[in-house]
């Protein structure tokens, strides 16, 4: 009998807690413009860099970041989503552009940054192209924390031994791959978990940027004959032995160092990992922008990834967070950040520490290149999850691409139907 | 009347009624407040559509329908069953073996130590070191290569081999705990029946079957019960080594739940999987424990 | 009264074989530990995965130093130590009390109550993280040591109750009856009779739960924020990610460092498992 009472007691406690939960979250903005700002990030490995930046922000803006790093990106997303309901909603946090940010903006959870952007664009601190990524319904939200271009890294020693130059056309890249395979060297790195999308992204956007755009808006189906053709090309390359063993668990930076493969298609933040693995920038490794698959394209498409720095609308530190965001955009902050982190800077007036990254920044800014959003941010999350799995399965066991594409398209159909 | 003062053990109906309640109360309260209340919230969410923002919207059993409709869910269930069977067979079996071998053996406690050390290695360490061993061209392949076996399978890519090797990696970590629990069981066995059996000339396997095994039952129930529960919610090692891939080949139920909740922000669907997993686990545990425990000691 | 000294149950040749089997198996078990150590000792700049079995150089200390610098590990040690000691101690006592109530005091519907407590372990921890975070931040328990101790205690109780309940069923009920005849109260019987008899089980539960808490990553990640409250493994995990950060050998070195205290704990508590129980004292 008593045991039957257990659920009752628990149910009572639960309804009490739900009552609590229904009282909305968030705190009053305390209006402070100086002091300690609580900052949450999913780039936990950068925590020491943010701490280093505090020296500059303390003296210039009188704001100190109190950084909490989350090493698990998925747990982090859930934590931030939940925090909007509590009085812990963050004064400053990192997020993803694309549909994930749109979702928060639609719920009115993000503080507007239009004024900050207007000032930054007027001062020539940031390009109008980048502003587009942060614009929703004509207003801006968040500021860019980091920016990365997806390029091809290569082992310079291998290229030198084989007498290979950086390719300028897709055909040259293919002949390099053939030549390396002939010499018993695997040309490209690949993995069957998480980073499974980049080659697909590269070939689709490099064939036709509009086709790529269509995939992310649902106008183009994954089973479109043009997409199937691209997958067939990928399959041919897999069968020709152009890609590394999908079962390898070696860290990609170490793999490139020890010559497991000659090239890796990765974001420009990869310099940090390669340096850490003991390779010297410009000596042991270098990078090139991957030529477009379709030689008739006027501009070479380059995938760009940009991580925003956002302020919660209902945070008690909203004013402080926005004050910091404004400072963040300045050349002074960006130069200090580039020194601490060693990454590409979005602000052309900032000084970049690594000459290779400096050069990359100038190259892609020219009219010969066209930036497009990385597949990871451009694709709605449910479709992305399935696509990453399916590309992973394809990479592990390459075969007829149709079943993989059909599975992705089934999820896409569901998703777009729900959006109606 | 206070039961504490009762001096007649078989008096009245239940002289320790209140005393017993007092002893169990802290345990029940702690678990109820910190674990069951959040679980009820999860159960509520499983009947709603919720993305972590705004308010949950009641949709009835739709999430459950969607869950059973998904062919990948079935694969997940099968993998989870493989984990349950595998962990009962390997870590429990070896754990019992080690406990018996070290029992009453001079230096036995020290010989047991190597099996306990892996338990001390943190989860991050375990996933990293086993990826390192099992990856293509990794430590295992290098060792096999040295003995002339070069054509090794892709341990972490080919299904269901990847699940099998991950079960073995889990066994590596879990055997010591099971051995320790069995050892405690062996220690609680009274000496008289053992002496008597030995005087009768019983040794080895007969001694084990007739005396040790029946007397180990309470602790066997612990080890098997924990093993079933732990294997049904296998998550860390799979997330650390294959992330359920390639595709969804090595996904377990806990991983499917995690993906829906944390990756896709489908809190309702994720919660539905969690509820399903909880019911299955509880049912398995009750069925097993009822049979093992209630016959002898309680009414 | 049975004699305390127990004659070895098997003959000496069998002992040798047993020792040999255990030694071989034990060495096999230590192979991954060996790989962990030698690879944690390799300098990140020269680290490769092509010669996993051979030690190449000894940079263990500098790797450990780097791991501590990157993760702010030093700040976490004290609070993690508090969690790993306080929570299991409470949980062991609470669990033993529950087992005592069910077995010795023959609590009515004991099995149902037992299942109610044990049920606390059956669902995946990931599912209760978000409601816990929500509740914690409303009750000002988020990012406090008290909050961490509470949650660690709660998740350790079911295991502790399970083991203690089953351990106590191995003790004849007349032990309890004899104590009652001596005029002891239930509290006294619990603390003076049952707990001492269960010392090896209590120690086993303590070290297993302390290790579990010491190695916890998930609860620390969601329920804490500041360096002084965050447990050690959560801090450690922070230094590794796709976006740069620590190299493999640094991660391994950090993992090794974190594991050391638990290995020492195992070493120190071994003597509790060396002998059988003296059950004949009543």
Map each language-model feature to its residues.
Chain A
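Hinge/lid segment of periplasmic solute-binding proteins
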Residues: 98-150, 174, 282, 286-288
């Amino acid at each position: 009998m008593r045991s039957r009472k257990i659920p009752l007691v628990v149910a009572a406690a639960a309804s009490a807690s739900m009552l609590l939960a229904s009282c909305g979250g968030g705190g009053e903005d305390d209006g402070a413009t100086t002091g300690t700002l609580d900052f949450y990030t999913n780039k936990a490995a950068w925590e020491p860099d943010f701490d280093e930046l505090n020296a500059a922000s303390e003296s210039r803006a009188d704001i100190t970041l109190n950084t909490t790093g989350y090493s698990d990106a998925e747990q982090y997303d859930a934590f931030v989503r939940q925090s909007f309901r509590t009085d812990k909603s963050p004064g400053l946090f990192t997020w993803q552009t694309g549909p994930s940010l749109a979702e928060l903006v639609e719920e009115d959870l993000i503080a507007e940054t239009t004024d900050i952007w207007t000032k930054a664009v007027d001062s020539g601190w940031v390009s109008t192209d980048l502003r587009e990524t942060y614009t929703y319904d004509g207003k801006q939200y968040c500021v860019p924390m980091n920016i990365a271009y997806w390029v091809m890294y290569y082992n310079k020693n291998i290229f030198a031994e084989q007498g290979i130059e950086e390719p300028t056309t897709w055909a040259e890249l293919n002949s390099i791959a053939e030549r390396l395979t002939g010499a018993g060297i695997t040309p490209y790195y690949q993995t069957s978990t998480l980073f499974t999308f980049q080659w697909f992204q590269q070939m689709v956007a490099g064939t036709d940027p509009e086709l790529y755009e269509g995939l992310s808006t649902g106008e183009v189906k994954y089973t479109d004959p043009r997409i199937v053709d691209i997958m067939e090309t990928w399959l041919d390359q897999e069968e020709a032995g152009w890609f590394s063993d999908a079962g390898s668990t070696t860290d990609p930076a170490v793999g490139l160092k020890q010559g497991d493969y000659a090239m890796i298609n990765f974001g420009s933040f990869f310099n940090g990992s390669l340096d850490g693995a003991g390779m010297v920038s410009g000596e042991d490794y270098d990078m090139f922008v991957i030529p477009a698959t379709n030689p008739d394209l006027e501009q070479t498409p380059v995938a760009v990834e940009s991580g925003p720095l956002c302020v919660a609308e209902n945070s008690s530190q909203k004013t402080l967070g926005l004050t910091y965001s404004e400072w963040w955009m300045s050349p002074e902050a960006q130069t200090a950040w580039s020194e601490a982190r060693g990454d590409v800077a979005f602000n052309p007036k900032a000084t970049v520490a690594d000459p290779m990254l400096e050069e990359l920044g100038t190259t892609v800014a020219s009219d010969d290149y066209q930036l497009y959003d990385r597949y990871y941010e451009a694709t709605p999350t449910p479709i992305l999850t399935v696509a990453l799995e399916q590309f992973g399965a394809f990479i592990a066991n390459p075969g007829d691409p149709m079943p993989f594409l059909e599975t992705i398209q089934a999820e896409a159909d569901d998703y777009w139907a729900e959006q109606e | 009347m206070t039961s504490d003062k009762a001096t007649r053990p078989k008096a009245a109906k239940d002289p320790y009624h209140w005393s017993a309640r007092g002893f169990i109360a802290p345990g029940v309260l702690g678990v109820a407040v910190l674990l069951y209340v959040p679980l009820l919230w999860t159960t509520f969410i499983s009947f709603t559509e919720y993305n972590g923002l705004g308010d949950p919207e009641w949709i009835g059993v739709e999430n459950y329908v969607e869950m059973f409709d998904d062919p990948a869910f079935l694969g997940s269930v099968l993998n989870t069953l493989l984990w349950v069977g595998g962990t009962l067979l390997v870590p429990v079996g070896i754990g019992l073996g080690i406990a018996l071998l070290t029992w009453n053996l001079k230096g036995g406690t020290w010989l047991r130590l190597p099996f306990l050390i892996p338990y001390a290695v943190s989860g991050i360490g375990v996933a990293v070191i086993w990826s390192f061993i099992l990856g293509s061209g990794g430590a295992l392949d290098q060792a096999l290569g040295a003995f002339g076996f070069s054509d090794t399978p892709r341990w972490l890519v080919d299904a269901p081999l990847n699940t099998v090797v991950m079960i073995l990696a889990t066994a590596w970590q879990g055997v010591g705990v099971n051995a320790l629990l069995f050892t405690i069981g062996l220690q609680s066995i009274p000496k008289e029946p053992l002496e008597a059996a030995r005087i009768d000339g019983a040794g080895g396997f007969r001694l084990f079957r007739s005396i040790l095994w029946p007397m180990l039952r309470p602790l066997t129930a612990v080890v098997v019960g924990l093993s079933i529960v732990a294997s049904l919610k296998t998550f860390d090692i799979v997330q650390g080594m294959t992330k359920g891939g390639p595709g969804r080949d090595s996904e377990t139920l806990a991983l499917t739940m995690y993906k829906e909740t944390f990756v896709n922000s489908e809190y309702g669907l994720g919660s539905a999987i969690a509820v399903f997993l909880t019911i299955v686990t509880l049912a398995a545990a009750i069925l097993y424990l009822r049979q093992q425990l209630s016959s002898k000691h309680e009414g | 009264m049975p004699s305390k000294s127990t004659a070895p149950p098997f003959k000496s040749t069998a002992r040798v074989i047993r020792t040999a089997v255990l030694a071989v198996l034990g060495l096999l078990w230590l192979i991954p530990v060996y790989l962990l150590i030698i690879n944690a000792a390799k300098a990140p700049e020269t680290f490769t995965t092509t010669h996993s079995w051979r030690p190449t150089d000894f940079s263990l200390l500098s790797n450990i130093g780097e791991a501590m610098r990157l993760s702010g590990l030093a700040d976490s040690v004290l609070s993690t130590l508090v969690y790993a000691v306080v929570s299991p101690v409470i949980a062991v006592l609470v669990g033993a009390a529950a087992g005592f109530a069910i077995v010795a005091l023959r609590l009515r519907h004991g099995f149902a109550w037992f299942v109610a407590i044990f049920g606390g372990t059956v669902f995946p921890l990931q599912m209760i993280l978000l409601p816990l975070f929500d509740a914690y931040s409303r009750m000002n328990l988020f990012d406090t040591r008290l909050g961490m101790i509470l949650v660690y205690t709660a998740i350790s109780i079911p295991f502790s109750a399970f083991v203690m309940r089953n351990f106590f069923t191995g003790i004849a009920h007349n032990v309890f009856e004899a104590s009652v005849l001596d005029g002891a109260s239930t509290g006294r019987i619990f603390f003076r009779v049952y707990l001492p008899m269960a010392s090896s089980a209590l120690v086993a539960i303590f070290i297993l739960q302390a290790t579990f808490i010491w190695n916890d990553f998930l609860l620390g990640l969601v329920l804490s924020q500041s360096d002084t409250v965050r447990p050690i493994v959560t801090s450690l995990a922070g230094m590794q990610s796709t976006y740069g950060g620590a190299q493999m050998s640094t991660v391994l070195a950090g993992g090794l460092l974190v594991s050391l205290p638990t290995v020492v704990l195992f070493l120190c508590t071994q003597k509790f498992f060396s002998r059988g129980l003296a059950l004949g004292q009543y």
